From Swiss-Prot:
Promotes mitochondrial protein synthesis. May act as a fidelity factor of the translation reaction, by catalyzing a one-codon backward translocation of tRNAs on improperly translocated ribosomes. Binds to mitochondrial ribosomes in a GTP-dependent manner. Residues 89-272 form the tr-type G domain. The lineage of its organism: Eukaryota, Fungi, Dikarya, Ascomycota, Pezizomycotina. Residues 40-68 are annotated as: Disordered. GO terms for molecular function: GTP binding; GTPase activity; mitochondrial ribosome binding. It is a peripheral membrane protein. This is Translation factor GUF1, mitochondrial. It is found in: Mitochondrion inner membrane. Its EC number is 3.6.5.-. It comes from Sordaria macrospora (strain ATCC MYA-333 / DSM 997 / K(L3346) / K-hell).
């Protein structure tokens, strides 16, 4: 591979094959607590954390304060006036990519302050992260965009910058991939204390495959554990990047941040486009607004877009009239026109009512030019990798919970939804997610934004069945997996999804991590030392191992130093069986799982032991079993309450004693045959919790 320097990668380069991903979490964009200002009056806005001062942290002459009180219309007009004076060659569209928790959102805050887009202050934390769950967890779930106007300190000219803050977790890589379509360059951010990690590697190759210009940035240089020379060596060794121009910053204190934007302007190309040509507009993202309908985030390659224009959708064939256009600054600011090279928002009048009509990767053009303008390459729809069933804790809350789930799914097209029913838990839904964290975030959002309490079953991966006739079937619900009595399953071939996993870790933990991967039925592909003490392990692993807390086991074995990244590797033939939990020989359908035959006995013993702890004693004996097909692999028994039927008898009446005991035994047997085991919903909640 001929790795890129900080200039644009050539088309002849041959990056590794990557799985294309696409749309991911979508959401409405509420107002942030950041103060929106105009870049007009100049004041210093350097960060002053802990009295840290640096000549590098001096801000651009764009910073402002008093204009925050300016009326919205005048504020928008001032911004539009400055943008109109900036030619296309002074546009720069770029994103920040890095491993999770390397400081992307904090650096975004400093850049917004440095350009005067928001007023500098200690309250600016994760300004572009709109969700409560993002702020609580300290992660970015949804890629966020912002337009900035920057006055270059060398030539004194205005530059129009479009920034995308991308997620770092592997579950949301589709957000990163889609963000690249609106960018011509990327800041490759690396933590000075952690160094290159798994998703740093993955994001580099994604950017390399897209031909983006890369600017390496080393963050957190103010930390006591920072080792900048080691990180620069890793960037040179692993990526063959020229680190002589790497920018060293502390996003927390603002040190060195002033050097980033000049590097962006110098090393990243301007977007290519022509405002005089017919409209050619790519749909990058969308979200639903109660009053406006579907709002589109778009990138204009050619032409202009303004209120009243009639546009045509290549994906649906529908025509729309533009109601409003604008930019994110960082909140929505209406504009009269969007030009080629810009990224902004648009909604229609009458509004687009169905989020399904906004197909990510769709191309729009002016009505009448649909046969002339060539559509942009689209995105591949993301494939859910993890499926769960969700049920209300109280069936009386079904309607309210249905509305809450529908509202979230409306703004998160990567979630698949269908109705489900369980004899044990009642009516519910079957949900598909991009990964375990995606599922967890969805559940947190449901509880925070709608106050919903739900029971969510253990995550499961899909299974492919190839029948003897050659017909294929994908099973996402274990309850729908054929019973062993079905003669067709005996001649069918079963497949499970696999992933190509990349694990980075310190050298001293290699042995333990290899053992964990081998126990997870992994196949080692390579082991590389990218520094004297850091190792990259590449394994082919079943996707089921990822939902079985493989990452948690790796983190535990390496004292938190291991990092994991993965991508789809297709289907592999496997020996699979459905594991059922039986209560008095009756299957609890909501708990069923499809597992590999090597895991049946271990998982079965765990099930019966844990479930016994949460089931109350009954008036009759309760037998809890784990069954793989027709074979019982584990059993626990809950003894019944015992009534002392001998209390009124004399000790010498042995015949009467025996008769009463036999009668009690027969009664219990009859009760067990006709009685229903009463299992409280809280028992399922506790059993299904980690």
């Amino acid at each position: 591979m001929s790795a890129p320097t900080t200039t644009k990668a050539s088309a002849s380069s041959s990056p590794p094959a990557l799985r294309p991903l696409s749309s991911s979490l979508l959401l409405t964009i509420p107002t942030t607590n950041a103060q929106l200002v105009l870049p007009s009056v100049t004041v210093p806005a350097a960060r002053r954390h802990n009295s840290t001062k640096s000549t590098n942290s001096t801000t651009s002459t764009n910073s402002t304060t008093a204009t925050s009180k300016m009326p919205i219309e005048r504020r928008a007009a001032e911004i539009e006036k400055r943008i109109a004076a900036i030619p296309l060659e002074r546009y720069r569209n770029f994103c920040i990519v890095a491993h999770i928790d390397h400081g992307k959102s904090t650096l975004s805050d400093r850049l917004l302050e440095h350009t005067g887009t928001i007023v500098a202050g200690d309250g600016n934390k994760q300004v572009l992260d709109k969700l409560d769950v993002e702020r609580e967890r300290g992660i970015t779930v949804k890629a966020q965009t912002c337009t900035m106007i920057y006055k270059h300190k060398e030539d004194g000219l205005d530059y129009l910058l479009h920034l995308v803050d991308t997620p770092g977790h592997v579950d949301f890589r589709a957000e990163v991939t889609r963000s690249y379509s609106s960018c011509s360059g990327a800041l490759l951010l690396v933590d000075a204390s952690q160094g290159v990690q798994a998703q740093t590697v993955a994001n580099f190759y994604l950017a390399f495959a897209q031909g983006l210009s890369l600017v390496p940035v080393v963050n957190k240089i103010d930390m006591a554990s920072a080792d900048v020379p080691r990180v620069l060596e890793q960037l040179e060794t692993v990526f063959e990047l020229d680190t002589s121009t790497a920018v060293k910053v502390s996003a927390k204190t603002g040190q060195g941040v002033g050097e980033i934007l000049p590097a962006v302007i110098k090393k990243m190309p301007a977007p290519v486009g022509d405002a005089k040509k017919p409209l050619r507009m790519l749909l990058v993202d969308s979200w639903y607004d109660t009053f406006k309908g579907v709002v589109l985030l778009v990138r204009l390659f050619d032409g202009t877009l303004k209120q009243g224009d009639k546009v045509y959708s290549y994906a649906t064939g529908n025509e729309y009239i533009v109601g409003e256009v604008g930019i994110q600054y960082p909140d929505a600011v209406p504009q009269k026109v969007l030009r080629a090279g810009q990224v902004g928002y648009v909604f229609f009048n009458p509004g687009m009512k169905r989020i399904q009509d906004a197909k990510l990767g769709d191309t729009f053009t002016n009505v009448g030019y649909e046969d002339i303008v060539e559509p942009c390459p689209g995105f591949e729809e993301p494939k859910p990798m993890v499926f769960v069933a969700a049920f209300p804790t109280n069936q009386d809350d079904y309607g309210r919970l249905a509305d809450s789930i529908s509202h979230l799914v409306l703004n998160d097209r990567s979630v698949t939804l269908q109705k489900d029913y369980s004899e044990a838990l009642g009516a519910g839904w079957r949900l598909g997610f991009l990964g375990s964290l995606h599922c967890s975030v969805f559940q947190d959002r449901l509880r925070q934004e709608h106050g919903a309490s739900i029971i969510i079953t253990e995550p499961a991966v899909p299974t492919k069945i190839v029948w003897s006739t050659g017909q294929e079937e994908i099973v996402t619900n274990p309850a729908e997996f054929p019973d062993p009595d079905d003669h067709r399953i005996r001649s069918a071939t079963l497949y499970e999804p696999f992933v190509n996993a990349t694990v980075t870790l310190p050298e001293e933990y290699v042995g333990r991590c290899i053992e964990i991967c081998e126990n997870a039925r992994g196949v080692q592909k390579s082991l590389e030392f990218f520094t004297a003490t850091q190792v990259i392990l590449k394994y082919e692993l079943p996707a089921a191992s990822l939902v079985d807390d493989l990452f948690g086991k790796l983190k535990g074995a390496t004292k938190g130093y291991a990092t994991l990244d993965y991508e789809d590797a297709g289907w592999r033939q496997a020996q699979l069986v459905k594991l059922n939990l039986l209560v008095n020989k009756k299957a609890v359908d909501a708990v069923a799982r499809i597992v590999h035959t090597s895991q049946v006995e271990r998982l079965g013993r765990q099930w019966v032991t844990k479930f016994k702890e949460h089931v109350d004693r009954q008036m009759f004996e309760v037998i809890i079993q784990a069954a793989a097909g027709r074979r019982i692999v584990a059993r626990e028994t809950i003894k019944p309450f015992r009534k002392d039927v001998l209390a009124k008898l004399h000790a010498s009446d042995i015949t009467r004693r025996r008769k009463l005991l036999e009668k009690q035994k027969a009664g219990r047997k009859r009760l067990r045959a006709v009685g229903n085991v009463i299992i409280d919903q809280s028992a399922f909640q506790k059993f299904l919790s980690k």
